[in-house]
Amino acid sequence: MLQSALVGFSDRMQPLFGYGRGDDMPTPHNTANTGDIAKTVIMPGDPLRAKYIADTYLDNVVRFNNVRNIYGYTGVYRDVDISVMASGMGMPSMGIYSYELFKYYDVDNIIRIGSAGSISDKVDLRDIVLAIGTSTDSNYAKQYNLPGIYAPVADFGLLNCAYEQSKLYGIAAEVGNVVSTDVFYNDNPEYNKAWSNMGVLAVEMESAALYMNAARLSKNALAMFTISDNLMNGQSLSVEERQEGFDDMIKLSLETARLYNIGGGV
């Protein structure tokens, strides 16, 4: 099977390990066929959250992927086709799944949803951050051989839709920069303070790879996060509080996707 997946692969941007796909084949990480996935995908990190969104918010749901238990579903939300698929944790995982969705499944828009840790007094527990841009300690951009430092940013149309919907539904949302880190258990005690001094709102682990993939492939991306932990004072949400806060973010992401789709982008 691996040999057949390699035959005929001629993409200019060949993956590091040589995997590829033919025009009528799934990727090594996704069993979906062409047309199974909507133009807009909501991407939580947790596969069970992807299932929860599909079960709770979408109609006429069809599962298109369960490879490595990374669940993917397509359904209908308020008359608009929307897919939801998990990304896993970290930039390498997000990098793989978002790249394949953009490149091989003709997805145009990805909205990343997840949790983040606040490092700013501008956002506290339960608040939602809309990431206009993302700094990173990752070397993900090294593959592009750029002569400088790239600044990954969100698509303004998606960002504007999300911000307007947050005001409409009375959801507390702050627009600003986040930082994507490769390290969850950071040994540097000054890490968060240094980024906070630059006005960064929160720390997370995926958005830089998503934004860079979108830029490289001329697609659209937005990341939004619920603040589940305040890294400045040590406070955090309970399991029940996290679910309630995440529901607000899920609704915001779905309404953003719907408005963006019916409006043809902004």
Regions found by a protein language model. Give the residues of each.
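Active-site rim beta-loop-alpha module in soluble metabolic enzymes
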Residues: P152-M198
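Metabolite-binding pocket within alpha/beta catalytic cores that recognizes anionic/polar moieties
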Residues: Y19-N160
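Glycine-rich beta-alpha junction loops
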Residues: P47, G117, V179-F184, A209, ...
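N-terminal amphipathic/basic-hydrophobic helices that include classical n-h-c signal peptides
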Residues: M1-D24
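His/Asp/Glu-rich mid-to-C-terminal helical/loop segments that flank catalytic regions of hydrolases
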Residues: L231-V266
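Zn-dependent metallopeptidase/amidohydrolase metal-coordination segment
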Residues: A208-R242
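Flexible, glycine/charged-enriched surface loops at secondary-structure junctions
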Residues: D59-N66, G170-G176, N261-V266
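Generic non-transmembrane alpha-helical segments
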Residues: C161-Y169, N213, L252-Y260
